[in-house]
Swiss-Prot record:
This is Repressor of RNA polymerase III transcription MAF1 homolog. It comes from Rattus norvegicus. Interacts with TFIIIB subunits BRF1 and BRF2. Interacts with Pol III subunit POLR3F. Interacts with TFIIIC subunit GTF3C1. The keyword Ion transport does not apply. Phosphorylated at Ser-60, Ser-68 and Ser-75; the major sites of phosphorylation. Nuclear accumulation correlates with a concomitant dephosphorylation. Phosphorylation may attenuate its RNA polymerase III-repressive function. The modification Phosphothreonine is found at residues 64, 212. It is found in: Nucleus; Cytoplasm. Keywords: Cytoplasm, Isopeptide bond, Nucleus, Phosphoprotein, Repressor, Transcription, Transcription regulation, Ubl conjugation. Belongs to the MAF1 family.
Length: 260
């Protein structure tokens, strides 16, 4: 998995780290290419020792609604048109786990995560409503301006109409957001198989009484990184050349998003 550069996401992420007085919101949206690098290939070989890539794994019912996708299909259509909709292939499961590892490294390792810790969400509408309700209840009016910008950026990156949407709902021992003072959290994966890309949207709310500055690690890293870039650019040298080469490599993995 490789993190893809997205300036729109970077701008939105700066607005997803918010202090509300009694709570702190820390969120981020990231885009990943499903193209496997060296470490991913090695991990995938180990992963496949427990089952072939196309073997289906059972998922847990989604927490977004009281209905799993298969039961939703049955209740609406009269027949269970999608009896396997609560399952995914081991290859897809690997992509979800690899995305978590890339996003949370080096603090957490999700290599032992199991399929029952993931769910497939019933629909895009369910997920959008769940995200909107969580963020609006936390930041109120500030989210009204951010909401269209956020979802437009996600749609441009991943083409939401084509996505299967998964969530990560671990037990307390495995949850990176399960610390004391955690009020709520969500982890959604928007997977576009055609584009071979995943947009990962992770957010949590922490009680202000238990919050410490280190909790906002991502936001702090971004600020420190910006300062370092300013210092390096002021000093000249070949650093800019190396960064340009790295950006160019990232862009090679991107393909234009065309919603069909």
């Amino acid at each position: 998995m490789k993190l893809l550069e997205n300036s729109s996401f970077e701008a939105i992420n700066s607005q997803l780290t918010v202090e509300t007085g009694d709570a702190h919101i820390i969120g981020r949206i990231e885009s990943y290419s499903c193209k496997m690098a060296g470490d991913d290939k090695h991990m995938f070989k180990q992963f496949c020792q427990e089952g072939q890539p196309h073997v289906l794994e059972a998922l847990s019912p989604p927490q977004t609604s009281g209905l799993s996708p298969s039961r939703l299909s049955k209740s609406q259509g009269g027949e269970d048109e999608s009896p396997l909709s609560d399952k995914c292939s081991r290859k897809t499961l690997f992509y979800l786990i690899a995305t978590l590892n890339e996003s949370f490294r080096p603090d957490y390792d999700f290599s032992t995560a199991r399929s029952h810790e993931f769910s497939r969400e019933p629909s895009l509408r369910w997920v959008v409503n769940a995200v909107n309700c969580s963020l609006f209840s936390a930041v109120r009016e500030d989210f009204k301006a951010l909401k269209p910008q956020l979802w437009n950026a996600v749609d441009e990156e991943i083409c939401l109409a084509e996505c299967d949407i998964y969530s990560y709902n671990p037990d307390l021992d495995s949850d990176p957001f399960g610390e004391d003072g955690s009020l709520w959290s969500f982890n959604y994966f928007f997977y576009n198989k055609r584009l071979k890309r995943i947009v990962f949207f992770s957010c949590r709310s922490i009680s202000g009484s238990t919050y410490t500055p280190s909790e906002a690690g991502n936001a702090l890293d971004l600020e420190l990184g910006a300062e370092e870039v300013d210092e390096e650019s002021g000093g000249g040298g070949g650093g800019g050349e190396g960064r340009a080469e790295e950006t160019s490599t990232m862009e090679e993995d991107r393909v234009p998003v065309i919603c069909m």
